[in-house]
Amino acid sequence: MAVRELSPARCTSASPLVLARRTKLFALSEMRWAALALGLFSAGLLTQLCGAPQWVRWALFLACYATGGWEPGLAGLQALQRRTLDVDLLMVVAAIGAAAIGQIAEGALLIVIFATSGALEALVTARTADSVRGLMGLAPGTATRVGAGGGEETVNAADLRIGDIVLVRPGERISADATVLAGGSEVDQATVTGEPLPVDKSIGDQVFAGTVNGTGALRIRVDRLARDSVVARIATLVEQASQTKARTQLFIEKVEQRYSIGMVAVTLAVFAVPPLWGETLQRALLRAMTFMIVASPCAVVLATMPPLLAAIANAGRHGVLAKSAIVMEQLGTTTRIAFDKTGTLTRGTPELAGIWVYERRFTDDELLRLAAAAEYPSEHPLGAAIVKAAQSRRIRLPTVGEFTAHPGCRVTARVDGHVIAVGSATALLGTAGAAALEASMITAVDFLQGEGYTVVVVVCDSHPVGLLAITDQLRPEAAAAISAATKLTGAKPVLLTGDNRATADRLGVQVGIDDVRAGLLPDDKVAAVRQLQAGGARLTVVGDGINDAPALAAAHVGIAMGSARSELTLQTADAVVVRDDLTTIPTVIAMSRRARRIVVANLIVAVTFIAGLVVWDLAFTLPLPLGVARHEGSTIIVGLNGLRLLRHTAWRRAAGTAHR
């Protein structure tokens, strides 16, 4: 049975409001044809039991053949044109053979069960497509764009361009990934980040398409086109993953061709040899048709893809995008995980951690006001952290003049008539003079740097007046994720970072990582990955920066955090954690392992049924109806078993396994 791919046509709709709906069963042509075939078969069986004329039974059963068998028959003929022997065609031939020897009811039963298993397969594909449609339906169809003169116009969200200003009213869905320019509100972004409570948003904060604005109005600047938004990337990656095949499936399909040819040869032998020993042609043909049916690898072919596709769809709904069935399959074989530091275990965005004032004329807010004003024209990340801290305290920044940037050292500007310099301790000690810097200030700088903080000195009119400690905040879930990863894989994770040893060791202690490798360049990270894998580890590497891309490519599986601003990193990674929640990494590994267990169970069920029925048919006499029912029944069992991973409880169960 051919595994159907997710059709892009099934993932589009004219109305965004319809996109989140689940596909109804009878919206699928496979379901309609299977139901019609079942109805005709039931009617034919009823007429047979009631003693109706033979032509009535035959008419109903032949109609069952046509409705349930035309799609697999056509698919089989098309495969034959490509010189491929398809199981679909073999099943139709077997059903026709059954009719040829007067066993039309049994052949119709085969058609019905085969059509039903095909409908179940289509249902798996449709449910995956539903997840894609649901994601695409999160973003609104229109947006209120604000013109240069302040006028408002309603436009299609797809027509928004980078830099456009959009007004988001209370209760509206946000139409694009953007930055807040004015206003304040709380935003429900559970659909993208998974956070259960609304998140406060103010000037400078990032918002995502498809999230819901709260009680305040926001004016936002578009950062990404609609096709590049977070939800669009999720949908694209889930769709692409659904069109791939796992290594197990590729192996099965490779073997299937040779198996099918051998099966046809044995079928011919089963038909041709017994008459030489006196068996009737009709009995030999019946045995041969029964053999062809029960030896068909339908259940084997269906064993692999439904569980993996269901796992991909479920993980996608929870913010983890596996780019292919191969990736979903490989995740479960992970024996060790390596994490980058900045942007992975930490948020990747510098934040102000503390203020130390060394002149009584300044308060904390006044010192921050001067430093933020001086840094406002700067494009340095540390300067942005200082400005954001001032904005979060709602400090109004004064006008700045005579701004000068000295890259890597400091910035200077005239603020309120004072010359303010903000920069590194090393650079500004030379400017201000070590004699002017109090001993307590020197001690504080040394201590904070030893603790892993970046220290910024604020100088007013050539006199140092305060210190600002800036840090890259540890993700709150990092320690829990490391603990879960250790329990799940049986090996403690590794920290691979380009940061200095002191900072890396401090973070390792915080999250529970003993194997810390610091000061690594991109090539060094690749070498570390290869060394770990040479020791037998199947390594999953988690990173976010462009410097992590080579290591992600070299790993058994590479996972990028959704905050990664590098397109190269996102393209190189095998999977993406869109919601930036580290705890989903152990969960998706547990989900992959469960999918692999279901695949193995399916293969055991399929092979056991086929082997048992083949032996029964060749060694004894297997009634055709019983052979059809048991063979196709095993196919349906395998298909339904794979569908279990589509349920929301499957993700919760995987999370429970990973974090117990």
UniProtKB/Swiss-Prot annotation:
InterPro entries associated with the record: ATPase_P-typ_cyto_dom_N, ATPase_P-typ_P_site, ATPase_P-typ_TM_dom_sf, ATPase_P-typ_transduc_dom_A_sf, Cation_Transport_ATPase, HAD-like_sf, HAD_sf, P-typ_ATPase_IB
Membrane-protein topology: Multi-pass membrane protein
Induction (UniProt): Transcription is repressed by NmtR. Induced by nickel and, to some extent, cobalt.
Top-level enzyme category: translocase
Compartment(s) of residence: Cell membrane
CDD domains in alphabetical order: P-type_ATPase_HM_ZosA_PfeT-like
Catalytic residues in the record: D340 (4-aspartylphosphate intermediate)
Transmembrane segments: 33-53, 60-80, 94-114, 261-281, 292-312, 598-618
EC number of this enzyme: 7.2.2.-
One Gene Ontology term, aspect cellular component: plasma membrane
Binding site for Mg(2+): D544, D548
Known catalytic reactions: ATP + H2O = ADP + phosphate + H(+)
Similarity field: Belongs to the cation transport ATPase (P-type) (TC 3.A.3) family. Type IB subfamily.
Listed NCBIfam families: ATPase-IB_hvy (TIGR01525), ATPase_P-type (TIGR01494)
UniProt name for this protein: Probable cation-transporting P-type ATPase J
Source organism (scientific name): Mycobacterium tuberculosis (strain ATCC 25618 / H37Rv)
Gene that produces this protein: ctpJ
